[in-house]
């Protein structure tokens, strides 16, 4: 899609507010399509929660490693036409410090995902190239390019086929989480009654780690395609060219869907650990939700006043569900005319995905150093924004002689 982890499409309940919980804001949430109310079109710049977490963390990291003389430069001086020499010095300094981030002993989980869940796109991005993910965390991701915007717009278009977005004012993190979980509950109910939903947010506890993911599409299996009664998980990826991507990209897509199934099945079979949820995310279980949020919950047909009551609804909703279908579906679509390039069906491989999951978590917990992409896959370096400064790049040259990297998404979505 987009985890991430994410990984990236917008989640079906995308926060568009200030990150300060004390301030009020609005949250966009999805609900099943209604033909009785017409909402005006609002232009939206899609940035998923997982991507915002990466950007926020990268900003914090850059502040922590910049020397005091650079930190003391007034932002107003720079934006108002400050010295080009100062701006160049910051750029050169960031290039020289490309490896400084990994020298800090604190784990990436603690530094960049404190009180946050790891996104599925965090995990798939790490599998793509650990060194690239390390640099993305420490120094930030390049701006969304045209191809990525087209892909994001297509995901939004697909989502709007089955859900509509409404805005609800929020006043705290408890309000935000209540609406996120409510949106998941609504998505599951839509699947149960209509056989299909899109952009379904999942939050679960897998192998000692909180994981969040947004399933692109979820539908009931047709009788002719599977004897398994569980829902089929689907991910649609858009392509600039009407050809299939290389095997490492297809592998990454398969991993993404298997991680969604792992997350779904874990919630269904093992339940939702409510106590650890409130503790890890620093939430007040007895918090009385704001009036606007309570009104929206009531409109959804749920009687709840506190965050804990919504969490219980989320837990009980998934306890009624079957595990996901063992067959998964990865679709590739041509951006130009939205024609289907290929539909790849494959079976879930629990041992393989758990092996990959443990390997990736080791990186996030700093149990080992970040590895470079395998030698046979180092063609990826041609599309990496950090290639000029990365020793793993086969064409690595000194900054004075290297040529610009090619424009392409740094991580698979």
Curated annotation (Swiss-Prot):
CC terms in the record's Gene Ontology section: chloroplast
Assembly with partners or alone: Monomer.
Transit peptide: 1-47
Highest taxon above the source species: Eukaryota
Region of interest: Disordered: 1-32, 389-413
Composition-biased stretches (Low complexity): 1-19, 394-406
Gene3D superfamilies the record matches: 3.90.320.10
Cofactor binding annotation: Binds 1 [4Fe-4S] cluster.
Family affiliation: Belongs to the EXO5 family.
Annotated binding of [4Fe-4S] cluster, by residue: 129, 381, 384, 390
Pfam families for this protein: Exo5
Co-factor requirement: [4Fe-4S] cluster; Mg(2+)
Localization (cell): Plastid, Chloroplast
Enzyme Commission identifier(s): 3.1.-.-
Broad class of the protein's primary localization: plastid
Keywords, ordered alphabetically: 4Fe-4S, Chloroplast, DNA-binding, Exonuclease, Hydrolase, Iron, Iron-sulfur, Magnesium, Metal-binding, Nuclease, Plastid, Transit peptide
Coiled coil spans: none
Protein name: Exonuclease V, chloroplastic
Native source organism of the sequence: Arabidopsis thaliana
């Amino acid at each position: 899609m987009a985890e991430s982890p994410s990984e990236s499409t917008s989640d079906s309940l995308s926060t568009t507010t200030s990150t300060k919980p004390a301030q009020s804001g609005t949250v966009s949430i999805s609900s099943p399509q209604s033909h009785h109310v017409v909402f005006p079109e609002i232009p939206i710049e899609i940035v998923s929660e997982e991507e915002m977490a990466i950007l926020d963390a990268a900003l914090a990291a850059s502040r922590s490693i910049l020397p005091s003389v650079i930190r003391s430069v007034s932002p107003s001086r720079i934006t108002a036409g400050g010295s080009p020499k100062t701006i160049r010095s910051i750029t050169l300094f960031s290039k020289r410090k490309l490896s400084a981030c990994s020298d800090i002993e604190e784990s990436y989980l603690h530094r960049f995902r404190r009180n946050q869940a790891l996104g599925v796109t965090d995990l798939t991005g790490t599998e793509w190239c650990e060194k690239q993910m390390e640099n993305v965390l420490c120094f930030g991701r390049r701006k969304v390019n045209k191809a990525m915007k087209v892909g994001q717009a297509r995901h939004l278009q697909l989502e709007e086929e089955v859900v509509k977005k409404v805005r609800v004012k929020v006043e705290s993190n408890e309000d935000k989480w209540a609406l996120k979980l409510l949106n998941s509950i609504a998505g599951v109910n839509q699947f149960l009654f209509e056989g299909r939903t899109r952009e379904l947010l999942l939050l679960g506890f897998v192998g000692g780690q909180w994981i969040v993911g947004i399933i692109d599409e979820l539908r009931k299996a047709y009788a002719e395609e599977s004897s398994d009664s569980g829902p089929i998980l689907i991910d649609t990826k858009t392509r600039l060219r009407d050809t299939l991507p290389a095997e490492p990209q297809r592998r990454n897509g398969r991993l993404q869907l298997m991680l969604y199934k792992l997350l779904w099945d874990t919630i269904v079979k093992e339940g939702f650990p409510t106590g650890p949820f409130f503790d890890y995310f620093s939430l007040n279980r007895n918090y009385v939700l704001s009036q606007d949020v309570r009104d929206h919950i009531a409109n959804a047909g749920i009687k709840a006043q506190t965050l804990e009551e919504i969490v219980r609804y989320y837990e009980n909703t998934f306890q009624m569900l079957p595990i996901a279908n063992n067959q998964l579906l990865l679709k590739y679509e041509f951006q130009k005319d939205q024609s289907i390039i290929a539909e790849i069906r494959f079976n879930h491989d629990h041992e393989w995905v758990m092996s990959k999951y443990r390997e990736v978590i080791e990186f996030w917990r700093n149990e080992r150093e970040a590895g470079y992409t395998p030698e046979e896959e180092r063609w990826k370096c041609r599309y990496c924004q950090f290639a000029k400064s990365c020793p793993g790049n086969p064409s690595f040259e000194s900054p004075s002689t290297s040529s610009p990297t090619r424009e392409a998404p740094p991580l698979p979505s």
